[in-house]
């Protein structure tokens, strides 16, 4: 029974739960790696050993957080759980493929961990640029294992994307148009399209790298007429849509949370929100070379990528101001989920502003590969994606489990986390502006103060993570059942009770369109 339910599951709720548990576990691994990084940088001098091991930790931290924490939780966990419930579908379109998408991830994770256990590990950074990732600078199997890990994670995501697109287009009630689906459903569909279009390019790039390393091809080796810059173009054509893949489902969740706790029946500017997400998805594909301002492109190319990147700020601004307009005049309930959402809006905006700074090719020449870039993307990920995940988790926890969290503890957790992440990443802007380079385990004494502050902040965040584990334990141990849920008419996922029965919407859903 246990094996049939959890290994061979074809139920979107069980698979969603598996994704959430896997993502939480990977999140612990990723957090542990990040604390190793901050321990190393807490004071000048070396702690872990040589530069290679440090870079292996940095590389693994990135891969674990992106491919095994944020994506499985947001798309796999929340996506699987909520999309079928929100559109009144009995399950996903391809339930067995759904199970396969999940079970490709643990082997992928295993390959990534194996890559750091053999030879010297893959100390390439998550970008895996040749020639550093070639078979000369990285002899041995480490990079090859990392490439195979990425292949598996990529296949998993592509299959998941096909599944979500089919489900969302094909399994709505006949009377419901695409423009009547909730914003989270839209965000997952747009994310799935981005995955479907970008991952094959990554697969091509890393497969060419694999043959360069093992079969003596020269795709990225000038000695045989290749070009390492080609790899960068292929990687970033995936890598830039990827960062929007990481944040778009978060946008969807924040829209739901802000609307719900403002007591509104719909978000402000629904169509504007949809078009903004579609614009962000489209523009995400035509700005990739802003990661490459230092490789020597012509001034016209740089001018284009600078301008195109700045255009993304417009639909993003539409979203931020629509969230604020949703709050306006609402009957605001100060729940923990609302706090995460408000924290998201503020800190994501800060991260967006530093992004606008980095979009300027002339400034980026100076700031590229400094801690300013690290601070920028950690503001949008560590305080954007993670805050959205936390907000979504505390908001939908009663739906997933049938139990309520302790409100006071959840608010204390938010406060500690808020202080921790800001204390960790705000000083990194100063370090970057004074020229401290990324991916280096040691630094001149001049950078000591802000690094120490940053490392202290990381330990505050660790405290918050440990408190979160306690809060979840407390909720599951106390078993306070959910009494009522407000606004179920405009929040379809709550309609079947908390937790919903194993099978929902077994007969076609009746939709009364206003």
Swiss-Prot record:
Gene3D superfamilies hit by this protein: Cytochrome c oxidase-like, subunit I domain
Pathway annotation: Energy metabolism; oxidative phosphorylation
Residue ranges annotated as Mitochondrial intermembrane topological domain: 41-50, 118-140, 213-227, 287-298, 358-370, 434-446
Cofactor: heme; Cu cation
GO molecular function: cytochrome-c oxidase activity; heme binding; metal ion binding
Binding site for Cu cation: 240, 290-291
Cofactor annotation comment: Binds 2 heme A groups non-covalently per subunit.
Residue sites binding Mg(2+) per the record: 368-369
Membrane topology label: Multi-pass membrane protein
Positions annotated to bind O2: 244
Catalytic activity: 4 Fe(II)-[cytochrome c] + O2 + 8 H(+)(in) = 4 Fe(III)-[cytochrome c] + 2 H2O + 4 H(+)(out)
Positions of transmembrane segments: 12-40, 51-86, 95-117, 141-170, 183-212, 228-261, 270-286, 299-327, 336-357, 371-400, 407-433, 447-478
Top-level enzyme category: translocase
Subunit annotation: Component of the cytochrome c oxidase (complex IV, CIV), a multisubunit enzyme composed of 14 subunits. The complex is composed of a catalytic core of 3 subunits MT-CO1, MT-CO2 and MT-CO3, encoded in the mitochondrial DNA, and 11 supernumerary subunits COX4I, COX5A, COX5B, COX6A, COX6B, COX6C, COX7A, COX7B, COX7C, COX8 and NDUFA4, which are encoded in the nuclear genome.
Protein name: Cytochrome c oxidase subunit 1
Species of the source: Bos mutus grunniens
Lineage: Eukaryota, Metazoa, Chordata, Craniata, Vertebrata
Name of the coding gene: MT-CO1
